[in-house]
C-alpha cells in the first residue's frame, strides 16, 4: 500500500459487509500518526494539552445508501490528494470513510444495475429512476443512520463512534445528495445554531463556504448556503461532531436515488453521475485546503472548546435499571458520571418545571458539565433547547431524563460525589419456594419474559397489587409458578436468563397473599405465547413507512428477541389472518387497506380474538369507520388570509410540529401501562390528533395543562392537542385494538416508550 495511506477496518454491518476508513497524510506525518492522534485528544485531559500544528479533517460519505455519487467522490478525493494536491498533506491528516452504509448502498446499486438501460435513460419516468420500496437510503433495519450519531442504536453507528472518539477531528464534513432540482448546498448552515456552538465554529463555517464558493464560481456551478440545514438536533453527522469541538458540516449535491447515471431535471439539464462526483470532489478538496491553511488556529480553538467555565450538575433519580442503562449510554460517549453523597440542595426539577429542594441519594447519578465533553452533556441533558429560529429541520426536544423515564434535576450547587458503582444483582432460587417473581418496569424485564416464553417456561402476571410475605408486586409483575412448569431443567433456564438480563427475582413460599389476590386468583393470569405479524411493503395504493416498519423489526429481532412474521401488503387479500393472534400495522399511507372489504376482514379477525396494533397514521385506516370508536380530532384554527407571500412559511409553522415532548397522563391500572408511573413524557412528531375514545380506554391522554409541552409547537395547533388521545384500547368482540398515536419507537432511542409495545403484545387479553 502507498506509504501515505493506512486502511483501518473497524467492523461489519448487520449484513456482514466491512466498514473501514483510510488515513491519508504525508510520509512524515504517517510515521508519527499515533503521536498526532494522542496529542490531539490530550485536549480532553485537564491541564494537559500537547497541541499539534497538524489539522485533522474527517470526511464521511454515503451514510444514505442511495446517494451514490458520494462514495465515488471519496475515491477520487483520495486520488487527487495523493497526486496533484499532495501539498495539503504536509500539515493535514485526512480521514476518509468512503461508505458509512454499505448495506444500503449495495441494495441501491444492485437494483440499479439490474434495472438500468444501455445507454442510460434520462427521462425521470423511466423505471431506472423509480426505486422500489424500501429504497437504499437506510441500513439493513431501515434506519436512517444520519439520525443515529448520538443515539447509536445501530451497529454501524456503534462501531464508528468508537473510532471517531479515538480521533476527534477538527473538521468533519458529511456528504449527501438531495433532490435533482437543487444544485449544491454547503456551509454556512442555516439558523438555528445551538447556543453551545462557539464564535470560531460559526466563523470557520463562513470561511469554508467562501473557499467552496471560489471553486464553484470558477467552474460555473450553482450552489446555496444558509438555508434548510441547521445545527440543532444532536444526532446528525454535522451536529454531533460540532458538539465535540469540530467544524461540522453537511454537503448536499443534487441527485439521490432517482438520479442514476443521468437524469433531466426540471430545467432540462442533464444531471450526470460524473458531474455529481466532480462537485463532491471539489468541495472535499476545498475543505481540506482551507483546513490546511488554518491548521494552527484549528488546533488552538479545538483545545479552547473543551475548557468549560460553567458549573452545572445534572442529577438523575429513578429506577436503578434505567439509571444503569443511561450510564452505559454515557460510557459509550466517554462522558463522566458519578454517584452523589447524600446532601440537600436547591435544584431545578424537570418534571415540575421549577426550582425545588432536593435531597440526593446514593442511587442517583450525577453528570457534571465541568468536564471535557461538558458541551455535549449540556446539549443532551438540557430540558429546554433555545431556538434562534423556530423553523428547524428536525425535532426540538430530546432531554435524556425524559428519554429514559427518569427524574431530572439541574443545579449550580456543588455536589459531593464518589465513583459510580453499578448495583450487582445476585439471585438465590430457593427450592422450597413455590414461585419466583419480579417487578415489571424495564426492557430487561421484557427480554427476560421473551426468553422465558421462547424456552417454554410458563409465566403469570397480576392485574392487582400483591403483597406476599416480604415480596411486593405492583401490577404487571411476572410470577413463575413451579406448578405450571412441564420441563425438567426450568430452574437452570430461569437463573441463566435472569443473570443475562440483570433480573432480580424474589422467592415466594405460599400462594396466599396478605394483600391482594392469591396466586390462584383469576386476576393472576397466564401470559400467552403470541403469534405476531407485521404489515410491510407497498402496492399500488398503500405504502408502509419503512422507518416505522424497520424500527419495529429491529425491536423484535435485536431487543425483544421474539419471533415476528413479515407480511407483504400486496398479498393482503390472500393472507389468512387467523394464523396470527397479533397484527401490527406500522405508520404509513394507506388506501385500499382501509376499503370496505379489507376492513370487514380485519374486523372479523379481531372479533374472533385478534389483537390489532396501529401506529400513528395507520390509525386513520379505522378513524371514523363503523365498528371502531377512534375519531380524528379536527383543528378548527383558520389560516390568516391576510398574510404576505414572503411571510407564508412563518404562517405555516404556527400549524407545525417537528418534534416536541408532551406530558401524557397515564392510567397505569390498565395492562397497556403496566410498569409506568401516572405521568409519561412522550415525543410527538406529528400534528395529527385523535379524540378521546368514547367506547374504550384512554390509557394515555393529553389533558388541559399549560405546562405540558417541551420544545417547539406551533401556536395554532397547540390548543388542538389538549384533551386528545395518545394511547388507546378498545374491545371488539373477543379481540382488541391498540392505538399508538405517538411513535413509541421513534428512531428506537426513546427508551421509555418501548414497554408499551411489549404490554400490548403480552398483557392485553
What are these regions (language model features)?
Residues 1-83, 87-93, 147, 153-155, ...:
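Intrinsic-disorder/low-complexity accessory segments
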Residues 97-101, 111-112, 175-182, 618-619:
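Short, solvent-exposed turn/loop segments enriched in Gly/Ser/Thr/Pro and often Arg
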Residues 106-123:
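Aromatic- and acidic-residue-enriched segments that line the glycan-binding/catalytic groove
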Residues 164-178:
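Proline-aspartate-enriched helix->loop->beta-strand connector
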Residues 124-143:
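Aromatic- and acidic-residue-enriched carbohydrate-binding clefts of CAZyme catalytic domains
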Residues 144, 174, 252:
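Acidic active-site catalytic centers that drive phospho-/nucleotidyl reactions
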Residues 94-108, 649, 659:
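Short, conserved secondary-structure transition motifs
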Amino acid at each position: 500500500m502507498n506509504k501515505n495511506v493506512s486502511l483501518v477496518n473497524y467492523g461489519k454491518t448487520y449484513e456482514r459487509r466491512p466498514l473501514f476508513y483510510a488515513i491519508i497524510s504525508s510520509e512524515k506525518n504517517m510515521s508519527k500518526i499515533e503521536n498526532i492522534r494522542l496529542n490531539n485528544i490530550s485536549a480532553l485531559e485537564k491541564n494537559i494539552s500537547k497541541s499539534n500544528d497538524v489539522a485533522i479533517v474527517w470526511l464521511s460519505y454515503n451514510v444514505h445508501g442511495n446517494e451514490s455519487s458520494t462514495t465515488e467522490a471519496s475515491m477520487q478525493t483520495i486520488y487527487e490528494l495523493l497526486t496533484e494536491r499532495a501539498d495539503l498533506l504536509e500539515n493535514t491528516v485526512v480521514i476518509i470513510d468512503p461508505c458509512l452504509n454499505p448495506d444500503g448502498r449495495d441494495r441501491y446499486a444492485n437494483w440499479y444495475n439490474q434495472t438500468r438501460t444501455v445507454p442510460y435513460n434520462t427521462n425521470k419516468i423511466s423505471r431506472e429512476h423509480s426505486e422500489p420500496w424500501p429504497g437504499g437510503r437506510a441500513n439493513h433495519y431501515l434506519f436512517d443512520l444520519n439520525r443515529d450519531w448520538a443515539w447509536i442504536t445501530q451497529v454501524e453507528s456503534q462501531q464508528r463512534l468508537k473510532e471517531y472518539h479515538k480521533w476527534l477531528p477538527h473538521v468533519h464534513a458529511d456528504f449527501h445528495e438531495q433532490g435533482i432540482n437543487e444544485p449544491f448546498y454547503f456551509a454556512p448552515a442555516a439558523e438555528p445554531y445551538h447556543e453551545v456552538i462557539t464564535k470560531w465554529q460559526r466563523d470557520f463555517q463562513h470561511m469554508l463556504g467562501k473557499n467552496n464558493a471560489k471553486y464553484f464560481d470558477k467552474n460555473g456551478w450553482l450552489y446555496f448556503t444558509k438555508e434548510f440545514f441547521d445545527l440543532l438536533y444532536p444526532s446528525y453527522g454535522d451536529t454531533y461532531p460540532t458538539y465535540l469541538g469540530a467544524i461540522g458540516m453537511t454537503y448536499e449535491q443534487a441527485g439521490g436515488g432517482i438520479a442514476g447515471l443521468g437524469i433531466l431535471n426540471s430545467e432540462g439539464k442533464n444531471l450526470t453521475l460524473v458531474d455529481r462526483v466532480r462537485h463532491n470532489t471539489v468541495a472535499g478538496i476545498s475543505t481540506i485546503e482551507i483546513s490546511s491553511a488554518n491548521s494552527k488556529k484549528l488546533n488552538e480553538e479545538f483545545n479552547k472548546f473543551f475548557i468549560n467555565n460553567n458549573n452545572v450538575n445534572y442529577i438523575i433519580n429513578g429506577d436503578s435499571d434505567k439509571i444503569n442503562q443511561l450510564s452505559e449510554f454515557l460510557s459509550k460517549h466517554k462522558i463522566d458520571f458519578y454517584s452523589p453523597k447524600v446532601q440537600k440542595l436547591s435544584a431545578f426539577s424537570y418534571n415540575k418545571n421549577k426550582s425545588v429542594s432536593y435531597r440526593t441519594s446514593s442511587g442517583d447519578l450525577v453528570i457534571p458539565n465541568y468536564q471535557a465533553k461538558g458541551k455535549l452533556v449540556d446539549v443532551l441533558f438540557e430540558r429546554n433547547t433555545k431556538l434562534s429560529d423556530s423553523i428547524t429541520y428536525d425535532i426540538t426536544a430530546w432531554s435524556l431524563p425524559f428519554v429514559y423515564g427518569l427524574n431530572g434535576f439541574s443545579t449550580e450547587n456543588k455536589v459531593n460525589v464518589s465513583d459510580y458503582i453499578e448495583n450487582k444483582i445476585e439471585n438465590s432460587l430457593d427450592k422450597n419456594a413455590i414461585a419466583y417473581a419480579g417487578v415489571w418496569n424495564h426492557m430487561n424485564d421484557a427480554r427476560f419474559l421473551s426468553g422465558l416464553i421462547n424456552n417454554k417456561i410458563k409465566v403469570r402476571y397480576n392485574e392487582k397489587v400483591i403483597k406476599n410475605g416480604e415480596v411486593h408486586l405492583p401490577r404487571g409483575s411476572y410470577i413463575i409458578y413451579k406448578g405450571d412448569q412441564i420441563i425438567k431443567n426450568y430452574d437452570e433456564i430461569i437463573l441463566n436468563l435472569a443473570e443475562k438480563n440483570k433480573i432480580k427475582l424474589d422467592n415466594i413460599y405460599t400462594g396466599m397473599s396478605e394483600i391482594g389476590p392469591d396466586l390462584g386468583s383469576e386476576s393472576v393470569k397466564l401470559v400467552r405465547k403470541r403469534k405476531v405479524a407485521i404489515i410491510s411493503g407497498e402496492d399500488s395504493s398503500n405504502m408502509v413507512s419503512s422507518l416505522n416498519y424497520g424500527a419495529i423489526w429491529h425491536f423484535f429481532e435485536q431487543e425483544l428477541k421474539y419471533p415476528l412474521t413479515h407480511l407483504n401488503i400486496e398479498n393482503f387479500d390472500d393472507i389468512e389472518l387467523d394464523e396470527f393472534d397479533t397484527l401490527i400495522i406500522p405508520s404509513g399511507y394507506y388506501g385500499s387497506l382501509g376499503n370496505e372489504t379489507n376492513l370487514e376482514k380485519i374486523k372479523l379477525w379481531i372479533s374472533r380474538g385478534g389483537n390489532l396494533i396501529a401506529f400513528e397514521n395507520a390509525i386513520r385506516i379505522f378513524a371514523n369507520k363503523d365498528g371502531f370508536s377512534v375519531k380524528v380530532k379536527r383543528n378548527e384554527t383558520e389560516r390568516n388570509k391576510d398574510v404576505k407571500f414572503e411571510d407564508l412559511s412563518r404562517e405555516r409553522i404556527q400549524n407545525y410540529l417537528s418534534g416536541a415532548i408532551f406530558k401524557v397522563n397515564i392510567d397505569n391500572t390498565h395492562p397497556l401501562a403496566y410498569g409506568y408511573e401516572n405521568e409519561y413524557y412522550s415525543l410527538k412528531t406529528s400534528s395529527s390528533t385523535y379524540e378521546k375514545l368514547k367506547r374504550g380506554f384512554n390509557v394515555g391522554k393529553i389533558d388541559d395543562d399549560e405546562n405540558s409541552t417541551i420544545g417547539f409547537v406551533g401556536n395554532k395547533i397547540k390548543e388542538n392537542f389538549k384533551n386528545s388521545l395518545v394511547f388507546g384500547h378498545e374491545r371488539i368482540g373477543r379481540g382488541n385494538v391498540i392505538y399508538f398515536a405517538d411513535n413509541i419507537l421513534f428512531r428506537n432511542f426513546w427508551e421509555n416508550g418501548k414497554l408499551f409495545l411489549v404490554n400490548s403484545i403480552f398483557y392485553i387479553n
